[in-house]
């Protein structure tokens, strides 16, 4: 992916659903991953919560967004909003 002249590494992008937007300029997203258990071969779902910087306060609960890793913005924020993939209905 390219943004202007910059190349963006896909390993730095996280796709997730917004679960909270109660903080100013910050949203919390849940990123789910699926892995196969090495011994039992069952697909296991793991999820993590990430705090994302939303400069314009444009995300609402239920939106699907892409977040990109960036420098630390606060104690817990290490990601910023890249783009909104799908708006909530």
Swiss-Prot record:
GO MF annotations in UniProt: rRNA binding; structural constituent of ribosome
GO cellular component, one term: cytosolic small ribosomal subunit
Disulphide bonds in the chain: none
Keywords per UniProt: Ribonucleoprotein, Ribosomal protein, RNA-binding, rRNA-binding
GO biological process: translation
The keyword Nucleotide-binding appears for this protein: no
Subunit structure: Part of the 30S ribosomal subunit.
Family to which the UniProt record says this protein belongs: Belongs to the universal ribosomal protein uS17 family.
Described function: One of the primary rRNA binding proteins, it binds specifically to the 5'-end of 16S ribosomal RNA.
This protein's name: Small ribosomal subunit protein uS17
Organism: Leptospira borgpetersenii serovar Hardjo-bovis (strain JB197)
Taxonomic lineage from the root: Bacteria, Pseudomonadati, Spirochaetota, Spirochaetia, Leptospirales
């Amino acid at each position: 992916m390219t943004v202007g002249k910059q190349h963006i590494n896909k390993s730095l992008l996280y796709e997730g659903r917004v679960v909270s937007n109660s903080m100013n300029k910050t949203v919390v997203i849940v990123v789910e991953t699926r892995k196969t258990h090495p011994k039992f071969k069952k697909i296991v779902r793991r999820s993590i919560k990430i705090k994302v910087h939303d400069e314009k306060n444009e995300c609402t609960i239920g939106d699907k967004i892409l977040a990109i890793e960036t420098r630390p913005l606060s104690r817990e924020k290490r990601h910023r909003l890249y783009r909104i993939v799908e708006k909530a209905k």
